[in-house]
Amino acid sequence: LSFDFSTVSLTPRGTPASADGILENCLSGYLENAFLRVAARESSISQRVGYEYAAFQALGNYVQWPAIQWCTDSYDPRFRSWYVSAASGPKDVVIVLDVSGSMRNAGRMDLAKQAAKKLLDTLTDVDYVGLVQFSSSASTALGATTLLPATGSTVASMKQWVDGLSPTGNTNFVAAFDSAYGLLRDSSDYSTGCSKAILFLSDGIPTSWTTDNRRRVKQQGQALGGNFQLFTYALGSGADTSVLKKISCDNSGALWTVADGGNLADAMADYYTFLAPLQRPCQVRWTYYNDWSSGMPLLAACLATFKKDSPTLPTSCGGGTTGCMPELLGVACMDVSLIVTQVRVCSMGGASQSSSQPSSPSLDRPSLLC
């Protein structure tokens, strides 16, 4: 650990000579110097800032102060709760998993479970979450009839529920969407009031699907208002992309196709990049999270950054773009001294806690700024 230097971790996931690689390397160098300047102004060792760090969206490059030597191949900052919370703001998320008989093939059920658990790890205490499994019929995680706050205990229980899923039966899209929409519709008292999203995964062709079914799904989405989006994920060679594409495009979303054995977890966890442009710009997010290496609880003040002149975001709909939406560039954070009380921090707009950090029963849920 060195307080005289910053660490720049270049990801193995991209090409350094690409346009994204060159941009992220340049910005990493700038932030490396900026972090050192901030640290130099902190005279008190006991009350100085903690870590300063930033990560970039395109490749996942990461820079932090103080410098530390570590192996980062397995660490992707873009799916850490501090990053997603700052990028997307508070959100209501329903994850829908196909557990029909065909999910036994090519290890698809294991991929779906890994993806669902990775999604849960991106949430914080200001988010609300629901889980639906479907085959011939559909049911919700933990028997919930509304969304649940994404606290540490809720997330842990949902992960256990996911681990217990087993594939069997047919592929009933109608039952799945009715359950997912029901969670969102009946959660007026259990909602952030901000972005809403359904993440729908299937590997097969629906047992029955008509024009009326499509109209029903679209109307239920429209009833949720302008902050709702529906994202679909087609897993494997048997997935019906035509139906999933129409469903997502009817609801301001996007379709991802993932081959058998592909990185489904990263594809599904990337949903927040479409929510990011909807949040209030220049809004600092206060987030408790557990340090990746030490497991210690930390408090971070994070700010998402966007490209000023960015191209439109690609989707699978219409002409292939969503329209003029700012592109997420990355997130920069500073850990605040932990002598700051929880009460003081939670009185600030946008405060949140990582799903891995249990919420304090003595504190009210913080006020939210979308």
Locations of regions flagged by a protein language model:
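Short acidic, S/G/P-rich loop/turn micro-motifs used as interaction or catalytic elements
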Residues: S102-M103, G204-S208, I339-T341
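Von Willebrand factor
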Residues: R37-L59, A87-T151, F173-Y181, T192-S202, ...
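Surface-exposed intrinsically disordered loops and tails
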Residues: P149-S153, G164, D189-S191, T211, ...
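Intrinsically disordered, low-complexity polar/acidic regions
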Residues: L1-K91, S252-G253, D260-N263, D270-C370
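Sec-exported extracytoplasmic/periplasmic mature domains
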Residues: K117-D125, D163-S166, Y181-D189, Q222-A223, ...
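Eukaryotic intrinsically disordered and solvent-exposed regulatory patches
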Residues: A34-A40, C71, R78-Y83, N105, ...
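Soluble non-cytosolic domains of exported or imported proteins
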Residues: A17, G21-E32, A87, K91, ...
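VWA/integrin I-like adhesion module and closely mimicked acidic/polar interface patches used
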Residues: G107-L111, V129, L165-N170, A175, ...
